[in-house]
């Protein structure tokens, strides 16, 4: 699996892994698998992180770089499921005027009730960080929101 990676990808993985190697001994707590993958511009769901060995608690499992490289390769290979374009198409369904905007309240509803749901306590910081101000009619442009959420800016 790692043979599918370019030398540049392997170097990027080594660098990102080293950031989460807090002990400096070539290992990383599996709790940080998702964070490390996100640092490598991947956006795995919680289900994917769990599937590849990520843990919900610290110190449940320790992995080596040699174990993480194939994890990265697999998630990178599968990243087309749920691409930026797919998410854009979903948000366009809520763009009734076809002008690049949607109701702020609808976005809140989507984030609280569909897919990997956010908790109410998680919602406010996400919207504050990623959303432009809503206009006087309660609409926001959804493309800047999506770009920030998928780290494409």
From Swiss-Prot:
User: GO molecular function terms here?
Assistant: calcium ion binding
Q: How does activity depend on temperature?
A: Thermostable even up to 100 degrees Celsius.
- pH dependence statement: Stable at acidic (pH 1.0-5.0) and alkaline (pH 9.0 and 11.0) conditions.
Note the superkingdom of the native organism: Eukaryota
Domain (EF-hand): residue spans on this chain: 8-43, 82-117, 135-153
**Modification after translation (UniProt):** O-glycosylated.
Any one biological process term the GO annotation gives: muscle system process
The molecule here is called Myosin light chain 1
Report keywords, A-Z.
Allergen, Glycoprotein, Motor protein, Muscle protein, Myosin, Repeat
GO cellular component assignments:
muscle myosin complex
InterPro entries per the UniProt record, alphabetical: CALM/Myosin/TropC-like, EF-hand-dom_pair, EF_hand_dom
Quaternary data? Myosin is a hexamer of 2 heavy chains and 4 light chains.
Extract the SMART domains matched here. Answer: EFh
Q: In which tissues is it expressed?
A: Muscle (at protein level).
């Amino acid at each position: 699996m790692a043979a599918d990676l370019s030398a540049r990808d392997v170097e990027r993985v080594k660098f990102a892994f080293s950031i989460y190697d807090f002990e400096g001994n070539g290992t990383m707590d599996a709790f940080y698998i998702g964070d490390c993958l996100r640092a490598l511009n991947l956006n795995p769901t919680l289900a994917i992180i769990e599937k590849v060995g990520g843990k919900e608690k610290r110190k449940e499992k320790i992995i080596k770089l040699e174990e993480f490289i194939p994890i990265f390769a697999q998630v990178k290979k599968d990243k087309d499921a749920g691409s930026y374009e797919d998410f854009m198409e979903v948000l366009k369904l809520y763009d009734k005027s076809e002008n690049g905007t949607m109701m702020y309240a609808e976005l809140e509803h989507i984030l609280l009730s569909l897919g990997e749901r956010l908790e109410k306590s998680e919602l406010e910081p996400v919207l504050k960080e990623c959303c432009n101000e809503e206009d006087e009619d309660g609409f926001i442009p959804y493309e800047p929101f999506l770009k920030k959420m998928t780290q494409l800016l």
